[in-house]
């Protein structure tokens, strides 16, 4: 089972709010997911994100692939650098 770390949309019309989730890549964007690892609110200025670092690093270690947008969020949070340094 190939897993992705991606954004699942929530919130009202014209006011998106996203959950950062780990899901099977075959599932729908807002469908079934394995685990919720954080949130992302682009409506705030600057955009606010909260990630559970331990869970995120665990799933990256298991081979979950982040989408491009989630990878940028992980870089801003400093989690991506920690993951890359563990690999080296």
Swiss-Prot record:
Identify the stretch annotated as signal peptide in this record: none
- Per the record, a Pfam family? Ribosomal_S16
Q: Domain of life of the organism in this record?
A: Bacteria
Q: Name one GO cellular component term.
A: small ribosomal subunit
Keywords annotated in UniProt: Ribonucleoprotein, Ribosomal protein
Q: What biological-process terms (Gene Ontology) are attached?
A: translation
Q: Does the keyword Transferase apply?
A: no
Which terms in the Gene Ontology molecular function aspect does this entry carry?
structural constituent of ribosome
Cite the InterPro entries for this sequence.
Answer: Ribosomal_bS16, Ribosomal_bS16_CS, Ribosomal_bS16_dom_sf
Q: Which family does it belong to?
A: Belongs to the bacterial ribosomal protein bS16 family.
Q: What is this protein called?
A: Small ribosomal subunit protein bS16
Q: Which organism is it from?
A: Geotalea daltonii (strain DSM 22248 / JCM 15807 / FRC-32)
